Amino acid sequence: MHPNMKMWIGWAACAFLLFACLGTLTEGYPTKPDNPGEDAPAEELAKYYSALRHYINLITRQRYGKRSSADTLISDLLIGETESHPQTRYEDHLVW
C-alpha cells in the first residue's frame, strides 16, 4: 500500500468514529413532540401542550454541580452575595 492511501484510510476511520460518537450523543437528547395539527380534538391538543411543556422544561433546565467551571465557582465565591451581606442593586450610590 502507498503511504497516501494509508493516510486516507486513517482519515476515513476517524471520520466514521466521529460520526458514530455524534450519533450516540444525539440519542440522549429528548425528541420534540409531534404537532397533532390545527383540527385535532381538544384532548389531543391538551396532551400535545403537556408534552411540549415537559420537553421545554427538559431542554431548558438549569444544571448544577460538576458542569460548573472553576472560573465561575471562584468568582461566585469571591463576589457572591450572602444572606447576611446582600449585594446592592446599584454599583454607584446616588449623589444628591
From Swiss-Prot:
Function: NPY is implicated in the control of feeding and in secretion of gonadotrophin-release hormone.
Disulfide bond annotation, renumbered to this chain: none
Record localization: Secreted
GO molecular function, one term: neuropeptide Y receptor binding
Domain of life: Eukaryota
Residues bearing the modification Tyrosine amide: Y64
SMART domains hit by this protein: PAH
InterPro entries xref list: Pancreatic_hormone-like, Pancreatic_hormone-like_CS
Calcium as UniProt keyword: no
Any one cellular-component term (Gene Ontology): extracellular space
CDD domains the record matches: PAH (cd00126)
Protein family according to the UniProt entry: Belongs to the NPY family.
Signal peptide (residue range): 1-28
GO terms, biological process: feeding behavior; neuropeptide signaling pathway
Protein name as annotated: Pro-neuropeptide Y
Keywords linked to the UniProt accession: Amidation, Cleavage on pair of basic residues, Neuropeptide, Secreted, Signal
